[in-house]
Structure formats: C-alpha cells, structure tokens
Design a protein with these regions (language model features):
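A residue-level marker of the well-folded mature domains of exported/periplasmic proteins
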Residues: 2-6, 12, 24-407
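Hydrophobic helical h-region of N-terminal Sec-dependent signal peptides
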Residues: 14-18
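C-terminal motif of bacterial Sec signal peptides marking the signal peptidase cleavage site
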Residues: 19-23
C-alpha cells in the first residue's frame, strides 16, 4: 500500500528439511473478524497496553520498558524489498527502530534486515538471526510458501513468530499477526470509488476491478472488502462490472492489463485499483489517451507521494493511509511481550484472522486505516509528517495544495 503490503511473488522454497507450504494459490477467501484474542500475562504481571494506545510520538512504548529488561534474546525483523513499495526503508525500518528504542531495547537487542526481493536472501537472514540467538522473528514474507518454511524452521528452534503486515498462509502455529484491518482497507477503497463516481458525475459506470497479486493474502482481503461494498451496485444494475482480470503488484503489468481491457471494452469509465503504484500506472495510460481529470475514477492505498499527487490532480479519488508508525508500534509491543515470555493482552491482540490454508484462526493486532482525499489530506498525512509539503506541493500543484489547505 501496500499497501499499504505489496510485493512480487516469488517461488516457495525449502529451508533445511522443512518443505515450504505453498499456500499462495488457495482460492478460498480469507476473512478477518474483530473477535477478541490474546490472553492474560504469565506469572510476572505484565504491563497493559492496547491497540489504540499508539500515537505518533511513540510515548506508549515507554510503558513496556519492564518487558525490555525482563526479555532475553534478539528480535529479528525480516523486511521484503525496496521495489514494490518505498515504505519498508522509508518508514518501517525507522519506525520499528524508534519503537524498540523507546521501549528500552539497545542496539544489540534487535536487528532489521531487508531481503531486497529475494526469498533465498530472507531465508539466509532468518537463519542468521536464529543462529545469533533470536527469541522472536517478525516476518514480512515475500510469499506464503517461503514465509511458511522460515516460520517452521524458527518455531522448531523455539523462536516465537509474528506475521508482520501480511499473513503467511500455512504459517506457524502459535504465531501472532500484526497489520491493518485489510478488509476495512478494501471497504474504504470500494466506498471511495462509489463516492467519487457520484461527485465526479460519472454516467453509467462501467467498472474494471483490478486486484493485487492473488498469492498475497492481503490482496485477497482487499478484494473481499471492495467487492463486498460494490456488489449491491452491480446486483441492482447501478454499475456494470466489466471484468476482474488476474491481479498483480507490478505496475507495468497493471498498465498492460488495463490497456488490454480498455481496448476490448472501450466503455470502461472507472477502475478499482488496489494500490497507488498500480493506480499511477493506469493514470499514465489515461493521460496518454488525453482523458481529463475528474472524469475517470481510480483508487489506491499506501498514501504514497505519487498517489497523493494524483489525488490532488484529480486523477485518483483517494488513497488509504495506513499510519505505519501504528503498525510498527503494534509489532514492537507484541514482540516485547513474547521476548519477555508474556502473553500479549487481549487489549492489544484485538482480533483474529482466518488462515484458510492452515485452517487456523490467528490472533491478530488489527489497526485502523484512513481514507484520504483532498478534504482531509492536510489533517492526516501532512500533519503526521508522512509526506513533506515541499515534495508534495510541486509548482504544478500549488493551487491544488492551496485549495486543500496544505501549507
């Protein structure tokens, strides 16, 4: 986004004698619920913190300093790449570092690696963390097959596992999932499309629904959300669903798919795009065809610079903002409890997510996303410092920024 959690699919691999569980091709929809999960602390009274405690100043993390002093072992963080989203190095790494340090961990107590898009590199990084005495691994896997293999090897060594940002289908028993409510992300995209069609006065909407990569569990949840919101409009004939081709997180592939669909169905006049990068690729195609602003809705997520600028330009209806500082703190807090041998409280682990491959309900820390338009851009992403005004408000967008009260 993503994605807000969006990446190129890599093949499943084996880790030692562990056979990777290729859960990527499951066609069963995955549902997220708000059922309370988690449990009471262990024999030592643990500090209590909730999924709604976190703020942009990271002050809540100081409540967990006792956990940092009680805990043992390394917390290893495995990030996926730098190509599918700028978020991992620009936001996840510094925010996770800040969260760990605010809770009292030293530089030798945690380690953050990026696999640069290579499943074999992530495997090597995981093995190194385990060898160095990791007690907890945060896994933001490139794909479910390789992620499941890493998690199986980790749990075999007694290492606790957290699925960070994306659920690993077929992952380890006993893990915790930390992410935004990804069905809600999809619902925001779907409602944003509806609102945009109305405000831009799109006549007889013929919508192309474009998904993320089907092997990414988040993409499944996003689609569950926006298709659920749009289905009544399709069912009553208000909108026409032109098609829903195979999904991708590769923008160039998304552009090609859109152009092929538009050639075959020139009546398409709106697109559901699941993230900002794919939307940007589609918008580039629209601009080549000289389609004017505020006539052809697209959607997105991740609140990327290009996405926000496309919203200001009137080519994108909005973008889902997932404040990564919330997700980083949720993951760091969960890791601190596990490292200290404590069960994270139910106020933190506030939901469950169904892993249909493992046929398991995974305790989850679910954080709340925000739909960003020109109406609230100043009070959300700009206020939080997620984007610099100097980067956002280039000369061509001076008037749009002024109208949006961004300064």
């Amino acid at each position: 986004m993503h994605v807000l959690g969006n990446r190129t699919v890599l093949g499943a691999l084996c880790l030692g004698a562990v056979v990777a569980l290729v859960g990527c091709s499951s066609s069963t929809s995955t549902k997220t619920t708000g059922t309370t999960a988690g449990g009471t602390a262990g024999s030592t009274q643990a500090p209590q913190i909730s999924a709604t405690s976190f703020t942009s100043d990271f002050s809540a993390m100081a409540q967990l300093k006792s956990l940092a002093s009680q805990g043992k072992g390394l917390i290893g963080v495995l990030l996926p790449d730098t190509t599918t989203s700028a978020r991992y190095e620009s936001f996840d790494r510094p925010y996770l570092t800040k969260a760990f340090q605010a809770a009292g961990l030293g530089a030798n107590d945690f380690k953050i690696d990026n696999a640069q898009g290579s499943a074999s590199t992530m495997q090597t990084q995981a093995e190194a963390d385990i060898t160095q005495g990791a007690s907890v691994l945060l896994v933001d896997a490139l794909d479910s097959g390789s992620g499941a293999a890493i998690e199986a090897a980790a749990t075999a060594k007694g290492v606790k596992v957290i699925d960070y940002d994306r659920l690993v289908k077929g992952g380890a028993a006993g893990r915790t999932y930390v992410s935004f409510d990804n069905v809600k992300v999809g619902q925001l995209i779907g409602q944003g499309e509806i609102d945009c069609i109305s405000s831009w006065k799109v006549n007889k909407p013929n919508i192309l629904v474009m998904d993320g990569d089907p092997t990414d569990n988040n993409a499944t949840l996003f689609a569950q959300g926006y298709n659920g919101v749009l289905k009544p409009k399709f069912d009553d004939g208000s909108y026409v669903k032109v098609g829903e081709p195979a999904g991708t997180w590769t923008p160039s592939v998304a552009a090609t798919t859109f152009e092929q669909q538009y050639t075959a169905h020139p009546n398409i006049n709106a697109v559901v795009t699941p993230n900002d990068d794919n939307a940007n690729a589609v918008i580039a195609s629209l601009q080549k065809m000289n389609i004017p602003a505020k006539t052809f809705p697209t959607t997105g997520q991740d609140a990327s610079l290009s996405g926000l600028q496309n919203v200001l330009k009137g080519y994108q209806c909005g973008t889902v903002y997932k404040p990564i500082y919330l997700e980083a703190q949720g993951a760091a807090a969960t890791a601190l409890y596990l490292r200290a041998g404590q069960t994270p409280p139910a106020s933190l682990v506030n939901g469950t997510t169904q892993d249909t491959t493992a046929n398991a309900s995974v305790p989850s820390v679910l954080l709340t996303p925000v739909w960003v338009t020109t109406d609230n851009m100043a009070s959300t992403v700009v206020k939080d410092g997620a984007v610099k005004v100097s980067d956002l408000c280039i000369s061509a967008l001076t008037s749009a920024c002024s109208a949006a009260k961004i300064s």
